[in-house]
Amino acid sequence: MFSKEGMGDLMKKAQEMQENMKKAQAEIANTEVTGESGAGLVKITILGNHNVRKVEIDPSLMEDDKEMLEDLIAAAMNDAVHRIGEVNKNKMSGVSGGMELPPGFKMPF
């Protein structure tokens, strides 16, 4: 099936892939994206690790009802989470050679 050299090469490539994945995950964790709702009236900036960095609310919304503002904040947060998910997917597909890997995938060595 595999020669010793072939198996060694396979292990080396797997270890390189794991290192590249670690680097990509670190880059993703430091990536900042902004989600918006209400045509930009509410903006939420999050990091790749999903920590919220900033919330911006247009002053004109302070006069409107509380329920609408809550909906806009939730929509902006969902947009930001979706965007960071896309960044994560794109970054990791480059590292994994296009293979879909499960979230949190780690090499067994």
From Swiss-Prot:
Pfam families, alphabetized: YbaB_DNA_bd
Superkingdom of origin: Bacteria
Subcellular location: Cytoplasm, Nucleoid
GO CC terms: bacterial nucleoid; cytosol
Alphabetic keyword roster: Cytoplasm, DNA-binding
MF annotations from Gene Ontology: DNA binding
InterPro entries named in the record: YbaB-like_sf, YbaB/EbfC
UniProt KW DNA-binding keyword: yes
Presence of the UniProt keyword Disulfide bond in the record: no
Family as reported in the entry's similarity comment: Belongs to the YbaB/EbfC family.
Reported function: Binds to DNA and alters its conformation. May be involved in regulation of gene expression, nucleoid organization and DNA protection.
Alphabetized HAMAP family for the sequence: DNA_YbaB_EbfC
Subunit description: Homodimer.
Name this protein carries in UniProt: Nucleoid-associated protein Ping_2276
Organism per entry: Psychromonas ingrahamii (strain DSM 17664 / CCUG 51855 / 37)
